[in-house]
Amino acid sequence: MNNKKLKSKFIFITGGVVSSLGKGITAASIGNILKNRGFKVSIQKLDPYINIDPGTMSPYQHGEVFVTNDGAETDLDLGHYERFLDENMSKSSNITAGQIYQSVINKEREGKYLGKTVQVIPHITEEIKKKIIKAAIVHQSDIVIVEIGGTVGDIESAPFLEAIRQFRYEVGYHNVLYLHTTLVPYLKKAQEIKTKPTQHSVKELRALGIQPQILVLRSEISINKEIKNKIASLCDINPQAIFEALDVDILYQIILNLFEQRIDHFILNHFQLPNNIQIDLKDWRSLINCIQNLKEKVVIGLVGKYVILHDAYLSIVESLKHAAYYYNSDIEIKWIDSEKLNSTNVKTLLNDCDGILVPHGFGPRAIEGKILAIQYAREQKIPFFGICFGMQLAVVEYARNVLFLDGANSTEIDEKTPHPVITKKIKNSNLGGTLRLGSYRCCLQKNSKSEAIYQQTTIYERHRHRFEMNPSYVSLFEKNNDFLVSGFNPEKNLAEIIELKNHPWFMAVQFHPEFLSRPLKPHPLFKSFVEAALLKNGKNIKKSKLS
């Protein structure tokens, strides 16, 4: 590995004791603080699973697939990274074991190892290190934060941990920092904090040759100085380098909690970087203050097929929250399983919703429930927002119930439909890598609701779809002067946005606007949708101080 020209610093974040400790949130929070200190920060996630990417994984297994501008299908943690940092990630920001092994095997087939026996060490570990270096170069980062997926001790993580162990030796002590997150359980019955799991986790990490310089302790109660000193002594760590990550009601509070513990000072001192810029994170303080003092409440019905696992729609939920906070409003997501929605209960389930959102999805299961929800929103004049598959089904619903095209459908659902209003252009037997992915241009119709919302005529949005509105049906839809294709991609002439002129707020988009929404910069479509939902029942529209 050639590191002579490498100027980036690297923070490697590992986790111990249990999974789902919040390593991604810790990484994003530290990144936010360091960015506010004036450094160019990027974050990378190393996932130890053998899948090439999460694109073909079940939402029930993995949650949301987050799509980057350059078309990578990635872990949902990248959504946290982008929202906390307000920086775009890339394909180099999420590396899986599958990608690493595929790359090494391809090189072996091409003869690039000159007949050597290909092994985990050095070939797999070298490939991992190259991917880390590439992320630093692609993003031109001063500081790269690298989150290692999984838990220390998992067999899948072993090559990644060995690679980051070697990394410090090759780039230098003051260019690498190891941060370990662990759970510190609190036994309520005994009213006692237990440190043994943390001790064992650090011991296991040290046995792999990695001595963490920072510990971040996840706990439901504050950890006193005596406990921290005990952990420091037994884990051979500076007591000043032990920080706590308390359970919080507001996710963004973690940024302030770590900042107030001065974690950035310890990091910058270790890296021997300038540490004289004073910051106060006032925008984030204002956001948290706003969330703690919300005046109104809006109810959004989210009609989906994966609602059992809310993480399947994580970015949509966060985007709705961003927009609601912009209007000084709390938000209640009413989770509605489209498989259980039918003509006898649709009114009961949707009547109290201020707005209805039908999100993405794949396959024929539970689509009729979604179509019923769309019809109800259209006929009852309830603000409606369709995203990706939600747009496609809005087209199907309109074709069936307004244009009376009997049997109209998507060819994804019915290949023999007499009216294929939604079709697929790319035909491939494999599911992986065949989607239209990444950021594409969309031109907006002048004097349309879309143009009014965006306040511009050309936008770029991220996509993840295989099917699209059939161009040969567009003129038929627009004949009745209600249905409007208000956004289209000029390169492929694809319908990107539809809206109904005679409805208070009925819009559906082929792209995924939720991937571009930020806590301090809500996406314009979500803002407009939430505003319409608030207005539906005459609720007070008052922008927060964030606007």
Swiss-Prot record:
Pathway where it operates: Pyrimidine metabolism; CTP biosynthesis via de novo pathway; CTP from UDP: step 2/2
Coiled-coil spans in chain: none
Active-site positions on this chain: C388, H512, E514
Reactions listed under catalytic activity: UTP + L-glutamine + ATP + H2O = CTP + L-glutamate + ADP + phosphate + 2 H(+); L-glutamine + H2O = L-glutamate + NH4(+); UTP + NH4(+) + ATP = CTP + ADP + phosphate + 2 H(+)
Disulfide bonds: none
Binding site for Mg(2+): D77, E147
Positions of L-glutamine binding: Y60, G361, F389, G390, M391, Q392, E412, R466
Sequence positions that bind ATP: S20, L21, G22, K23, G24, I25, D77
A Pfam family it matches: GATase
SUPFAM superfamilies the UniProt entry points to: Class I glutamine amidotransferase-like, P-loop containing nucleoside triphosphate hydrolases
CDD domains: CTPS_N, GATase1_CTP_Synthase
One of the protein's GO biological processes: pyrimidine nucleobase biosynthetic process
Enzyme Commission number(s) of this protein: 6.3.4.2
Single GO term (MF): identical protein binding
Binding site for UTP: S19, K194, T195, K196, P197, T198, Q199, K230
EC main group: ligase
Location of the Glutamine amidotransferase type-1 domain: 306-539
PANTHER family linked to this entry: CTP SYNTHASE (PTHR11550), CTP SYNTHASE-RELATED (PTHR11550:SF0)
Subunit structure: Homotetramer.
Miscellaneous field: CTPSs have evolved a hybrid strategy for distinguishing between UTP and CTP. The overlapping regions of the product feedback inhibitory and substrate sites recognize a common feature in both compounds, the triphosphate moiety. To differentiate isosteric substrate and product pyrimidine rings, an additional pocket far from the expected kinase/ligase catalytic site, specifically recognizes the cytosine and ribose portions of the product inhibitor.
Record protein name field: CTP synthase
Organism encoding this protein: Phytoplasma australiense
Gene giving rise to this polypeptide: pyrG
